[in-house]
């Protein structure tokens, strides 16, 4: 039996998710970026970990296979937004989407349950992936220095703010897009988790630490079901 048999895991087929990831990587037209991404997603030592890893311990996609589900979802968002902003570089944005959380393979432990590794506690995934991706880039002879700097910047800036752990703010178009789309997918993942939980009162979910609020179950609300919450809901914001 797998650990995922006893803990929460993605409802998607991880093999299909991975096949989609390989397809997305192969579609990258920039040869340097495609070689970089494929050096990661086709690495035989990385693949099984990529299929198992969560995207977080508790904030979003915090289940086995969550990282892969998040990356594929984020790539889908990128494609939609790229159609609206055709001036953006699709290869650069997709590269950032695929690699932006790759450090979580080392930051998190996920063999038996989900937690943090010692390295993860000390360094965090941004530092881990910066070093990891930099080494991969340096192993590709002739990789353009300017392109290397853009990829590195997207990794360290994707949290968007200093207080959220990014040492630099996003400073070019694709870096900004990656930050906001990553945040959107993370928030929607947290909303989904809250709505799928059977905890809460009436039309409201239990308090979500990731979202810092309760979420309204709009289907029940629109059907005319009226509920009253305990006074404690008003004190949630003070938690």
Name each model feature, range by range.
Residues 2-3, 225-229:
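Intrinsically disordered, low-complexity linkers and terminal tails enriched in Pro/Gly
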Residues 29-33, 45-49, 141, 163, ...:
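Residue-level signal for secondary-structure boundary elements
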């Amino acid at each position: 039996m797998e650990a995922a048999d006893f803990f929460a895991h993605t409802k998607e087929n991880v093999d299909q998710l991975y096949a989609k990831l390989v397809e997305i990587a192969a579609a990258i037209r920039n040869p340097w970026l495609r070689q970089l991404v494929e050096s990661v997603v086709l690495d035989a030592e990385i693949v099984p970990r990529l299929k198992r890893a969560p995207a977080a311990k508790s904030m979003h996609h915090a289940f086995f296979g969550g990282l892969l589900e998040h990356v594929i979802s984020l790539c889908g968002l990128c494609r939609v937004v790229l159609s609206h902003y055709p001036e953006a570089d699709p290869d650069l944005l997709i590269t950032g989407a695929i690699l932006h959380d790759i450090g979580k393979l080392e930051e998190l432990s996920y063999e038996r349950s989900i937690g943090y590794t010692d390295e993860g506690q000390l360094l965090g995934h941004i530092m881990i992936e910066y070093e990891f991706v930099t080494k991969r880039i340096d192993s590709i002879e002739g990789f353009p220095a300017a392109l290397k700097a853009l990829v590195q910047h997207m990794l360290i800036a994707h949290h968007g703010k200093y207080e959220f752990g990014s040492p630099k703010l996003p400073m070019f178009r694709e870096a900004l897009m990656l930050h906001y789309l990553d945040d959107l997918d993370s928030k929607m993942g947290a909303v989904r988790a809250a709505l799928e939980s059977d905890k809460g009162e009436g039309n409201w979910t239990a308090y979500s630490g990731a979202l810092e609020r309760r979420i309204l179950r709009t289907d029940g609300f629109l059907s005319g079901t009226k509920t009253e919450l305990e006074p404690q809901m008003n004190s949630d914001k003070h938690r």
